[in-house]
C-alpha cells in the first residue's frame, strides 16, 4: 500500500499542475510578466494537450516494455521540469518567458501520458481485488487537489521586487515534490505483470490496418473530442468569463465548486451505473452541460457561475470520458483496444486544438464555442443511443 500511496500522490500534484493555468489569477500574473493578454495563457494549457498527443503512441508500449517504475519515473521527472520551468519562465519575463513556458508545457503533457500508462495499470495490479476502486482513487486524489487549489494559491502568492504578483513558490514546491516522488518511485516496489506480455501486444498502427470502423464507432471517437472540450473550455476559460462579463474580481473559488462536483459525481455516477446503462449518460450528461452553459451565458451572475462550476464539474468532468470508453468496450468488443486508444487521442487532440483556438477569443466567444461543441456532443450521444439496441445485438453475436 505505501507504493500505491506514492503513485496516488503523483496524481494529487498532477491535479494542481493540470488546472493551475486555468486559474484567472495565475493567468494574470503570467500575462503581466510576459507582456501578453490573459487569454493568451490558454495556449500554454493547449501545449499540455499537444505534449500528451505526442507521447500517446509510444508511452504505452514503452510502459509495457520497460515497466511501470520507469514509465512513472519518466512522468514524475518530466512533470518536475514542467512546473519548475513555469517559475523560470515567469522570471524570464519578456525575454522568451512565453516560449519557455510553452516548451515546458509540452513536456508536462508528455509527463501526463507516462503517468497514465505507468500508474493506471500499476494501481490496478496493486489493488487487484478492486481495480475499479483503484482507478477511482486516482480521480479522487486529482479532485481533492483541485478543490483546495484556490486556498493554496492564497497561501503561496507573493510580490516581486518589481511589483509583479508571483506564484513561483507554488511552482517550485510542486516541482520539488515531484523530484521526491521520483526518488520514492525508484525505491519502492512496483508491479510489472504486463511487462512479460509486451512482445505479444499489437501496436495501434498495426491494428488500424485491418480494423473496420462503423459510423457508430466514429461517433464514439468524436464523443471523446466533444466531452473533453466541454470541461476543458470551462476549466481554462470560465474564470476569465466571470471576471470580464460578470465583474467578479477573484473567481478562483469556482475551482473548488467545480472539483466538488467532480468528486461527488465519481461516487454517485458509480452508483447510478448499477441501475442505468452507461450509454444513457453519454447523452444525459452533455444535455445537462448544454443547458447549464446556455443559462450561464444568458444570466451572467455570481450565483450562476458557482452553480455552473459545480454542474460542469459533475456532468462534464465527473467521469463522462471514462463512461464513453466503457461504452466503446461494450459495443465494439473486437476493436475495443483500438477504439479506446482513438477516443483518448481525440481527447488529447481536443485539448490542443480547442484551447489553441480559445486563446485567440474573448471569454464570451469561448462560452459560445463551448455551447456549440457540447450541442454536437448531444447529437452524437443521441445517435449512439438510438442505435444502441442494434449495436448491442451485433456485439453479442460477434
Positions of predicted regions on the chain:
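Intracellular juxtamembrane helix-capping segments at the cytosolic ends
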Residues: 114-127, 318-332
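C-terminal transmembrane helical hairpin of 12-TM major facilitator-type secondary transporters
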Residues: 277-323
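A late C-terminal transmembrane helix in Major Facilitator Superfamily
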Residues: 329-363
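Helix-to-loop junctions at the C-terminal end of transmembrane segments
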Residues: 55-68, 265-278
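C-terminal ends and interior cores of transmembrane alpha-helices
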Residues: 77-95, 288-300
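Cytoplasmic helix-loop-helix junction between adjacent transmembrane helices
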Residues: 104-140
Amino acid at each position: 500500500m505505501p507504493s500505491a500511496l506514492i503513485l496516488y500522490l503523483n496524481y494529487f500534484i498532477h491535479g494542481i499542475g493540470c488546472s493551475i493555468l486555468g486559474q484567472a489569477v495565475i493567468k494574470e500574473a503570467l500575462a503581466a510578466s510576459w507582456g501578453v493578454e490573459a487569454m493568451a495563457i490558454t495556449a500554454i494549457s493547449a501545449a499540455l494537450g499537444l505534449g500528451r498527443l505526442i507521447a500517446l503512441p509510444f508511452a504505452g508500449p514503452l510502459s509495457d516494455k520497460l515497466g511501470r517504475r520507469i514509465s512513472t519515473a519518466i512522468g514524475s521527472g518530466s512533470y518536475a521540469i514542467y512546473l519548475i520551468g513555469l517559475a523560470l519562465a515567469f522570471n524570464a519575463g519578456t525575454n522568451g518567458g512565453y516560449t519557455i513556458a510553452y516548451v515546458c508545457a509540452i513536456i508536462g503533457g508528455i509527463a501526463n501520458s507516462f503517468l497514465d500508462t505507468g500508474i493506471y495499470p500499476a494501481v490496478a495490479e496493486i489493488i487487484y481485488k478492486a481495480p475499479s476502486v483503484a482507478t477511482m482513487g486516482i480521480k479522487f486524489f486529482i479532485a481533492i487537489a483541485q478543490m483546495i487549489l484556490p486556498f493554496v494559491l492564497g497561501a503561496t502568492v507573493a510580490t516581486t521586487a518589481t511589483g509583479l504578483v508571483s506564484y513561483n513558490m507554488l511552482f517550485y514546491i510542486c516541482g520539488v515534490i515531484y523530484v521526491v516522488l521520483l526518488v520514492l518511485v525508484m525505491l519502492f516496489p512496483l508491479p510489472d505483470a504486463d511487462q512479460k506480455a509486451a512482445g505479444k501486444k499489437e501496436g495501434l498502427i498495426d491494428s488500424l490496418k485491418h480494423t473496420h470502423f462503423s459510423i457508430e464507432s466514429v461517433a464514439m471517437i468524436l464523443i471523446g473530442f466533444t466531452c473533453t472540450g466541454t470541461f476543458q473550455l470551462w476549466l481554462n476559460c470560465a474564470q476569465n468569463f466571470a471576471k470580464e462579463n460578470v465583474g467578479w474580481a477573484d473567481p478562483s473559488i469556482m475551482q473548488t465548486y467545480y472539483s466538488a462536483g467532480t468528486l461527488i459525481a465519481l461516487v454517485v455516477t458509480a452508483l447510478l451505473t448499477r441501475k442505468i446503462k452507461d450509454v444513457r449518460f453519454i447523452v444525459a450528461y452533455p444535455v445537462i452541460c448544454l443547458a447549464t452553459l446556455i443559462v450561464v451565458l444568458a444570466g451572467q451572475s455570481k450565483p450562476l457561475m458557482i452553480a455552473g462550476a459545480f454542474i460542469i464539474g459533475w456532468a462534464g468532468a465527473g467521469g463522462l470520458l471514462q463512461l464513453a470508453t466503457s461504452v466503446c468496450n461494450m459495443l465494439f468488443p473486437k476493436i475495443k483496444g483500438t477504439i479506446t486508444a482513438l477516443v483518448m487521442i481525440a481527447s488529447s487532440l481536443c485539448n490542443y486544438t480547442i484551447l489553441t483556438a480559445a486563446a485567440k477569443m474573448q471569454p464570451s466567444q469561448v462560452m459560445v464555442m463551448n455551447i456549440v461543441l457540447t450541442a454536437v456532443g448531444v447529437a452524437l450521444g443521441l445517435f449512439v443511443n438510438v442505435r444502441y439496441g442494434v449495436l448491442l445485438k451485433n456485439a453479442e453475436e460477434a
